[in-house]
Amino acid sequence: MTTNYIFVTGGVVSSLGKGIAAASLAAILEARGLKVTMMKLDPYINVDPGTMSPTQHGEVFVTEDGAETDLDLGHYERFIRTKMTKRNNFTAGRVYADVLRKERRGDYLGATIQVIPHITNAIKDRVIAGSEGHDIAIVEVGGTVGDIESLPFMEAIRQLAIEVGREHAMFMHLTLVPYLAAAGEVKTKPTQHSVKELLSIGIQPDILVCRSDRMIPANERKKIALFCNVPEKAVISMKDVDSIYKIPQLIRSQGLDDLVCARFGINAPEADLSEWEQVIYEEANPTGEVTIGMVGKYTELPDAYKSVNEALKHAGLKNRLSVTIKYVDSQDVETKGTDVLNGLDAILVPGGFGDRGIEGKIRAAQYARENKIPYLGICLGMQVALIEYARNVAGMEGAHSTEFNKNTKYPVVGLITEWVDGEGNVEERSEKSDLGGTMRLGSQLCHLEKGTKAYELYGSATIHERHRHRYEVNNLLRPQIEKAGLKVSGLSADKKLVEVIENPAHPWFVAAQFHPEFTSTPRDGHPLFAGFVKAAGQFQRGELK
């Protein structure tokens, strides 16, 4: 099978939405019956985003095989059915590390290692390996054209397009077309300069996707086509919309997928976007609204919780409810008290690291438990719920996690030193292990106990969910907590690690060690989030019992 490549680049400014545009195109091509995959090439020197600050980079998305990747891979999985793996995202740091490792081994037989050809060849090899077995691979290059860091990647995709043949490669470039209110018109000059920069490194775009707050007028489209050397029909308007799930229809209406199929000589049926039409209908026609408080420490940047935000929206679609997320800094709960949690229909404590704001999260879990407010804890959100219950119900005064207090009398949460991964291999860690890539990562099997809330929600005794953590419930103290009434409803494959807890004395109090948000999609939702948002609606109406 010959794979066709669409290389996606961006210009003028960052954060234009390359990932959304690429994923939307992928969704349309998939709806035409094509086998599509996506890749993200990140020019930064970090080996992966696993140890990067969420306030700088946004969330770390975890794939089924345990790769810590860019949040754009979350967009990819939410738009298409293909599951991402460690092959679908790599960084300049990863490429350089691999090349240097080979040089130390002597694989290059004494050659002088250079960006061209060694780094560019390594990039091309990874792109080819990650796209095998697919009709179309959409490859997004991070950053903005002109960045020093992205030059090796730009050179690599330029070379690869020549090597596979231009009949099997396309370049799609996203640019900004700003509207100047004073002049009353959109300006095309930034796009012209961006394409000029791209041409200077040997890449002629085949498609221009123009980001603006409005549709690009016909005269301006003609002007862009003329000065940027692309057909007028290849100038695509991508205006601001109130939902990212409207983008597939927006670009389909302008024939972007037809351009791609014509270029690659693909004869495929028309795209069936009925599933996306249903998503848009559900989003536009809610029967009610709920407010969910997200208590975390990275609340100044919503992208730090991108998958959780989207999962809540998906759950809203399944319940025909509009979900408003109120971000609550956990430090505010510490300094201002639980009054900041008043008026919420449900409380969610997501994952996180570090002790800043930890007591605020614990108090939020206590507030939800005592006031019978629906509570969903994810990863650290499960651990704080357990700590709170141990302290205030089980009589274990000062109970804590060894992540935050190594000398606690009741270490109800501690470092995992050994576990079995998703492939059955035994993994071992210690406090001296590196931070990067040393967590329990990826999809793991979980056993759910029949008759529990978790089992009721999933409708199955076995599930697979993705993990990203290095601390777990201390089994030595577990019996004391369970005796006080807390229910362990989910266990790992070897039955040694606690995966799900719930409070039978509460109408809806569930917390999981895994990250269910990574598998939620707009078309299918996720049972845990769907049940949580449903409970929020019932709580608001006074029907939750």
UniProtKB/Swiss-Prot annotation:
Gene3D superfamilies on file: 3.40.50.880, P-loop containing nucleotide triphosphate hydrolases
Segments for region (Amidoligase domain): 2-266
Keyword Methyltransferase: no
Gene Ontology biological process terms from the UniProt entry: 'de novo' CTP biosynthetic process; CTP biosynthetic process; pyrimidine nucleobase biosynthetic process
Positions annotated to bind UTP: S14, K187, T188, K189, P190, T191, Q192, K223
Pathway membership: Pyrimidine metabolism; CTP biosynthesis via de novo pathway; CTP from UDP: step 2/2
Binding site for CTP: S14, D147, I148, E149, K187, T188, K189, P190, T191, Q192, K223
Catalytic activity line of the entry: UTP + L-glutamine + ATP + H2O = CTP + L-glutamate + ADP + phosphate + 2 H(+); L-glutamine + H2O = L-glutamate + NH4(+); UTP + NH4(+) + ATP = CTP + ADP + phosphate + 2 H(+)
Ranges of residues in domain Glutamine amidotransferase type-1: 291-542
Misc note: CTPSs have evolved a hybrid strategy for distinguishing between UTP and CTP. The overlapping regions of the product feedback inhibitory and substrate sites recognize a common feature in both compounds, the triphosphate moiety. To differentiate isosteric substrate and product pyrimidine rings, an additional pocket far from the expected kinase/ligase catalytic site, specifically recognizes the cytosine and ribose portions of the product inhibitor.
Task performed by this protein: Catalyzes the ATP-dependent amination of UTP to CTP with either L-glutamine or ammonia as the source of nitrogen. Regulates intracellular CTP levels through interactions with the four ribonucleotide triphosphates.
Family: Belongs to the CTP synthase family.
Name of the protein in question: CTP synthase
Species name: Vibrio cholerae serotype O1 (strain ATCC 39315 / El Tor Inaba N16961)
